Structure formats: structure tokens, C-alpha cells
């Protein structure tokens, strides 16, 4: 799934062409603290790329198992899902998302655009900068970053959101919205979770490579559907949609769980629904 680095081959080709050192562009120095291994790419469905250090002028596609380093910037494709195991926390990236791990002795992350779900036990284990603000806490948090606005939804635990000199604490089941240049809004309840999933506890069977139709009771203008491992709460693929129904193709054989969450007009995301079951069979 990943492409091998091409820097050595490129250097040899330039040397063979007789390019003198004086004619070559200077190499940007590596930032202090960059390149330190901090985790691995635990899962990738579709495209996730990393900007290559030190100049970050080119991107390389990653594969599950690849090492992650301080100074890295990641971006996902339009339908991609990726899970980063950073040791101190797990970050699940949604589609069209960009995230950076700064080259710093203080481990943190920066969400530049898109959706990230961060999970880490303990107090203040999660540290992330987004827009003009910063979020700290422990538990499970969903952040959505769009132009000029950030939404934060606490699914578990508690988090402090700070921007424009003001700090707001959100606890499980609460969220806040931050407009760039302004303090966080007062904590508000998250939207209600969708319900009445079909298929539900009785699984639907679908042939591998054929789409399965998923339906639910909508509770907000936008929804996110996730396919999960049968035993673990690990998202394998996800799709953003308006309302039901949604037809998705499962590219692997096996039995999976699925669930759906809702997002209101401000971008606050609900807790996930209960799960339904889907079986993808080869024939």
C-alpha cells in the first residue's frame, strides 16, 4: 500500500547527470526534535499520506505498521479512515483530514482540518491545538475543524477547551463550539443519538463486493456511519452522509458491527448509537 522513499535514487540520478553541488538547491535543516519515533499507523482504509521531512514538499503514502515521528504531517483521502497509535493516545482520522505532530519535546497534536477522534486514559493525556485554541483532558473526544470554526464533543471523560483567554470545561455528553478569534461557547448537550438501526441485532447477510443498505432514525441534519470490528471498538471504515438510507460496500469477509452518530448544524457530534450487525460472505 505504501510507496518506498525515492530520495536516494533521485540523488544518484542527479549525480549521474553531472549536476554540481553548487547548482543543487540547499536542503532545509531538520527542525530540532523532529524525526523521533512516537508510534505507528495501526490501520488505514484508503489513502493516508505523510509529508516528507525536512522540507515537507512531497507526500508519501503510508501503510499499516509504518512508524510515525515527531514533525510529521498527515492527510487522508476523501473516503479514508486511519488510526494512529501514538502510545499516549489513539487518534482516528476521518476523510479529508490533516493533522500534525509538532517537532517538540512536549508531545501534542495539531488538527488543521477535518475530523479527529482522540482517546486517551488519565488526566490531561490528550493535548491538541486546533484553530486559535487548545484542548486538554482525558477520555474520548471528537473534534471537527472547518473554516473559521472548531467543534468539540466529549464522548467520555472531561476536557478543557481554551481560546481567546477563556477556558470552558466539557464533560461526557457535552460539547462546545469555538469561532476563530472568540472564546469557546458555553457547554451544551450533544445531539441525541440516532436509533432504530436496520439491520440491528439480527444481522443482514450480504455477498462480498455487494452493497448493503443501512437505515436508522435520523436525529440531526448530518450523520456519520461507522463499520467496526466485531470484538473491538476500532473503526474500519466510515462514511459521512445527510440522512438514511446509506448503501456501503464492505471490502472484507466476516461479521462486523455498524453504528451511526449525528451532527447538528454547528458541527457538534452525538454519542454513537447502539450497534447493528452485518455479515459479509464470499458466496
Language-model segments: residues:
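Short strand-edge motifs at loop-to-beta-strand transitions and within beta-strands
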Residues: 244-246
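Short proline/glycine-enriched turn/loop motifs at strand-loop junctions of beta-rich domains
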Residues: 44, 217-222
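Flexible, surface-exposed loop/linker segments and immediately adjacent secondary-structure boundaries
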Residues: 24-202, 230
Amino acid at each position: 500500500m505504501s510507496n518506498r522513499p525515492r530520495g536516494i535514487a533521485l540523488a544518484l540520478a542527479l549525480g549521474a547527470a553531472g549536476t554540481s553541488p553548487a547548482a543543487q538547491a540547499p536542503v532545509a535543516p531538520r527542525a530540532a526534535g523532529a524525526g523521533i519515533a512516537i508510534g505507528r499507523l495501526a490501520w488505514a482504509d484508503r489513502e493516508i499520506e505523510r509529508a516528507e521531512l525536512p522540507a515537507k514538499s512531497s507526500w508519501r503514502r503510508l501503510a499499516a505498521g509504518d512508524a510515525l515521528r515527531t514533525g510529521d504531517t498527515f492527510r487522508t483521502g476523501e473516503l479514508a479512515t486511519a488510526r494512529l497509535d501514538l502510545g499516549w493516545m489513539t487518534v482516528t482520522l476521518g476523510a479529508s483530514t490533516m493533522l500534525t505532530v509538532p517537532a517538540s519535546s512536549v508531545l501534542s497534536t495539531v488538527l488543521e482540518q477535518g475530523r479527529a477522534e482522540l482517546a486517551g486514559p488519565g488526566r490531561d493525556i490528550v493535548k491538541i491545538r486546533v484553530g486559535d485554541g487548545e484542548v486538554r483532558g482525558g477520555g474520548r473526544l471528537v473534534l471537527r475543524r472547518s473554516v473559521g470554526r472548531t467543534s468539540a464533543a466529549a464522548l467520555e471523560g472531561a476536557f478543557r477547551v481554551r481560546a481567546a483567554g477563556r477556558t470552558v470545561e466539557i464533560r461526557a455528553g457535552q460539547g462546545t463550539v469555538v469561532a476563530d478569534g472568540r472564546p469557546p461557547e458555553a457547554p451544551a448537550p450533544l445531539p441525541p443519538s440516532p436509533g432504530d438501526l436496520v439491520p440491528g441485532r439480527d444481522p443482514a447477510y450480504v455477498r462480498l463486493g455487494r452493497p448493503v443498505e443501512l437505515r436508522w432514525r435520523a436525529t440531526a441534519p448530518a450523520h456519520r456511519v461507522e463499520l467496526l470490528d466485531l470484538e473491538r471498538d476500532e473503526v474500519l471504515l466510515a462514511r459521512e452522509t445527510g440522512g438514511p438510507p446509506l448503501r456501503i460496500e464492505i471490502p472484507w469477509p466476516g461479521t462486523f458491527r455498524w453504528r451511526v452518530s449525528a451532527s447538528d448544524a454547528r458541527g457538534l457530534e452525538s454519542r454513537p448509537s447502539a450497534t447493528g450487525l452485518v455479515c459479509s460472505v464470499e458466496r
